[in-house]
Swiss-Prot record:
It comes from Streptococcus thermophilus (strain ATCC BAA-491 / LMD-9). Pfam families: tRNA-synt_2 (PF00152), tRNA_anti-codon (PF01336). This is Asparagine--tRNA ligase. Its main location: cytoplasm. The keyword Acetylation does not apply.
Length: 448
């Protein structure tokens, strides 16, 4: 059998031709003289059909019956080389199918644990290394790949340079209570929560920079939106205003959605994602509302029949129900800007004339997906930043390099970060973030 293989995703290019593919058997059915194989090769799924009379005619009765019997008894996830003629077939959900003419078993698969029946989440997570082979999980990872590709493409086109921040650090970028600590040759070190502080150094050297890599948060959270290890894209830029930053963030998110539509259309179809709704998010401008305006809206509607959130006063932080209501109220991704300084990071620049608010923004995704981007303008004044650190009782010695950026040619600058898994969950329309990463790390899960 020829081993010049064709990928399933390229099969439509070979209508009327005999081809060979390498694939796994996702499922099979049939009876009597016909057998149907559901095949996958990592690029897509499609169907092959084997007719017993055709095998007898081609190979003779003894060998033909033997090959057809092999097909009928293939077990789930057996790997095979399969040869056949590609034929258009309107009855097939793929629009075409493979008329199988030969088969060769590569690797047997006996007792595959994930069968077509329903399984519980814990069982599927324990077998995550195998669950990834399912149609839905493959589709989610294809969307993840499309979003990562679109990230690199967007920043390259917008003049950004990839800048690699360290994963081990001696300081915290955000909340020090959420750090994973390790020993670094006798000195305490921490797994990175964010590359932001180092990216600011990159922005002072290169103007526009971004990084992309794993970050770690020791959050004891069991929600559907939290992981302890996830992949973060952080971007930093010099000489950009707050409004220009929001414009950039909006363009970036729209590019990610478009990237998934362009590069993973079959995956979106498998997941039954409403692509017209995604296109609406691209076509319409994102809403921008201040934190205080959002609080006023929440208070005005808190007694409506369809609301389900707790009362908030000005100065309170949002919970997930509040974020969901805000984004659903506007129906498109919504920037909430200028939060209280009291619960935001030390490095955020105050709103001119209103030191109780900072120049920041969270982008809230509709459909209940909540925050997907957090960003701010950074405090670029040395004395103001030192005063803020002293107010919070921070150890300046851990941040000398960061303060130096304000001593030697400081400029207005800002940045934002996006957790790729949250974006994947939103674009894919899935319910839980654990499916947006190949091997999720959560409060009570570090295997497989």
């Amino acid at each position: 059998m020829s081993k010049q293989l064709v990928s399933i995703i390229d099969v439509p290019k070979h209508i009327g031709e005999e081809i060979t593919i390498g694939a796994w058997v996702a499922n099979k059915s049939g009876k009597g003289k016909i057998a149907f194989l559901q095949l996958r090769d990592g690029t897509a799924f499609f169907q092959g059909v084997a007719f017993k009379p055709n095998f007898i005619e081609k190979f003779g009765e003894e060998e033909g019956l033997e090959k057809f019997d092999t097909i009928k008894h293939l077990s789930q996830e057996t790997s095979i080389y399969v040869t056949g003629m590609v034929k258009e077939d309107e009855r097939s959900k793929f629009g075409y199918e493979l008329d199988i003419t030969d088969i060769e078993v590569i690797g047997e698969s006996q007792g595959y644990p994930i069968t077509p029946k329903e399984h519980g989440t814990d069982f599927l997570m324990d077998n995550r290394h195998l669950w990834l082979r399912s149609r839905k999980q493959m589709a989610i990872q294809q969307i993840r790949n499309a979003i990562i590709y679109a990230t690199y493409d967007f920043f390259d086109k917008n003049g950004f340079i990839k800048f690699d921040s360290p994963i081990l650090s001696s300081n915290a970028a955000e909340d020090s209570t959420e750090l994973f600590e390790t020993d670094y040759f006798g000195t305490p070190a921490f797994l990175s929560q964010s590359g932001q502080l180092y990216l600011e150094a990159g922005a002072m050297a290169l103007g526009r920079v971004f990084d992309f890599g794993p970050v770690f948060r020791a959050e004891k959270s069991k929600t559907r939106r939290h992981l302890t290890e996830f992949w973060m894209m952080d971007a930093e830029y010099s000489f950009l205003s707050h409004d220009e930053s929001l414009d950039l963030q909006e363009a970036y998110v729209k590019a990610l959605i478009q990237g998934a539509i362009d590069r993973a259309p079959q995956a979106l179809e498998i997941l039954e994602r409403d692509v017209d709704l995604l296109k609406k998010y691209i076509a319409e401008p994102f809403k921008r509302v201040s934190y205080d305006e959002a609080i006023d809206l929440l208070q005005a509607h808190e007694k409506d029949e369809d609301t389900d959130y707790e009362h908030l006063e000005h100065g309170d932080d949002f919970g997930s129900p509040h974020e969901t209501w805000i984004s659903n109220y506007f129906g498109v991704p919504t920037f909430v800007v200028n939060y209280p300084a009291s619960f935001k990071a030390f490095y955020m620049k105050p709103v001119p004339g209103n030191p109780e608010r900072v120049l920041c923004a969270d982008l809230l995704a509709p459909e209940g997906y909540g925050e997907i981007i957090g960003g701010s303008m950074r405090e670029d004044d040395y004395d103001a930043l030192v005063a803020k650190m002293e107010e919070l009782g921070m150890d300046r010695s851990e941040y000398e390099f960061y303060l130096d950026l304000r001593k030697y040619g400081s400029v207005p600058h800002g940045g934002f970060g996006i957790g790729i898994e949250r974006m994947v969950t939103f674009v894919a329309g899935t319910k839980h973030i654990r499916e947006a990463i190949p091997f999720p790390r959560m409060l009570h899960r570090i295997k497989p």
